[in-house]
């Protein structure tokens, strides 16, 4: 469990550093649905941009620099969706000011960099923003696994892709942490760690890099979790948009059709299959209530700040996640299995 904190009376007040798309289009709208905390401020490198989004989203305070928001004594928690190379520096800066930080994934560019966040003051919570672990479909799927309905778990298979060849997009900038492994491979890795409830021992990967961007545009890996448990995944930034998670055991299989970008407009479904038919005839559809995973994520983080409920996944978990990504990149160079 992640270390917790005890906040004084009054709602937790959030600040958002950056007007990145994921924040203003997904995370902040989800947060604004909640009455469990306040979204007090938003910051951008340019004040007019911050003011524009503050007005559009109904956020009271706008800042023209990240440092101004971090220094605001009225802010208790910060959400950091900055480009990947700024995750650790700005998260650490905020933590040293006593702010709790929910940082977008990946939490850093390497495990060594992520470990710098261990310098956060005692009682300050730092966590990686894997919103999927708060969605009812993931929680239900894991509950099915833990109850043994799939038998002995053997494999987790993940596909996740989209098409983006825009040279101005941060996902295509190698020097600041662009590429498939950082952007969406992290979801595949967390899928294996979540459902196996274990840490992998070794990785072998195959990576194809864009000849112009030098980012990994297709990354595939086989991840060994020991005891006959395998995670296999392919992720890509220049493929048709698609996502799927399959969890397979000796007695059954779970399929999550929209595992990562679950829509908020309607109920979600996962499929439980006993494998008696090669098609889907034997599959049972399990309907889950509609939910905003970003809202649920922020509420869980807020409860941890308030001392009401410890986070299940904190900084230690984020560092373990980065160790797997490190091994994926080492295997690309060695063309061999790499220990995690």
Please give the residue ranges for each predicted region.
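N-terminal Rossmann-like dinucleotide-binding module
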Residues: 1-57, 302
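Beta-strand-loop-alpha-helix segment that lines the small-molecule cofactor/substrate pocket
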Residues: 77, 83-133, 148
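Hydrophobic residues in well-ordered beta-strands that form the structural core
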Residues: 23, 63, 80, 102-103, ...
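Predominantly a Rossmann-like dinucleotide-binding segment in NAD(P)-dependent oxidoreductases
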Residues: 124, 132-212, 335
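C-terminal helix-rich "cap/oligomerization" subdomain common to oxidoreductases
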Residues: 1-11, 77-79, 286, 300-340
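NAD(P)-dinucleotide binding in Rossmann-like oxidoreductases
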Residues: 209-216, 226-297, 314
């Amino acid at each position: 469990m992640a270390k917790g904190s005890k906040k004084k009376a009054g709602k937790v007040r959030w600040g958002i550093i950056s007007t990145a798309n994921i924040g203003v289009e997904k995370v902040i709208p989800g947060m604004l649905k909640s009455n469990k905390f306040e979204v007090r401020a938003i910051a951008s490198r340019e004040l007019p941009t911050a003011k524009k989004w503050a007005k559009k989203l109904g956020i009271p305070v706008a800042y023209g620099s990240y440092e101004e928001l971090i220094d605001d004594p009225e802010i208790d928690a910060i959400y950091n969706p900055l480009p990947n190379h700024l995750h650790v520096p700005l998260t650490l800066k905020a933590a040293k000011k006593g702010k709790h930080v929910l940082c977008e994934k990946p939490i850093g560019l390497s495990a060594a960099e992520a470990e710098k966040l261990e310098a956060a003051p005692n009682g300050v919570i730092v966590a990686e923003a894997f919103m999927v672990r708060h969605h009812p479909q993931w929680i239900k799927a894991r509950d099915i696994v833990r109850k043994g309905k799939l038998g002995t778990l053997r494999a987790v298979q993940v596909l996740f892709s989209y098409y983006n060849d825009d040279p101005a997009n941060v996902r295509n900038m190698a020097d600041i942490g662009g590429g498939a492994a950082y952007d969406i491979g992290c979801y595949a890795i967390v899928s294996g760690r979540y459902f196996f409830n274990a840490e992998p021992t070794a990785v072998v990967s195959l990576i194809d890099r864009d000849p112009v961007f030098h980012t990994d545009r297709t990354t595939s890996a086989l991840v060994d979790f020991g005891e006959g448990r395998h995670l296999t995944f392919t992720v890509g930034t220049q493929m048709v948009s698609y996502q799927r998670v399959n969890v397979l055991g000796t007695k059954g299989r779970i399929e999550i059709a929209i595992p990562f970008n679950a829509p908020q407009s309607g109920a979600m479904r996962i499929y439980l299959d006993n494998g008696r038919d090669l098609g889907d005839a034997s599959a049972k559809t399990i309907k889950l209530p509609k939910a905003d995973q970003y809202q649920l994520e922020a509420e869980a983080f807020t409860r941890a700040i308030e001392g009401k409920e410890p986070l299940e996944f904190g900084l230690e978990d984020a560092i373990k996640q980065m160790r797997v990504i490190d091994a994926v990149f080492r295997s690309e160079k060695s063309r061999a299995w790499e220990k995690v």
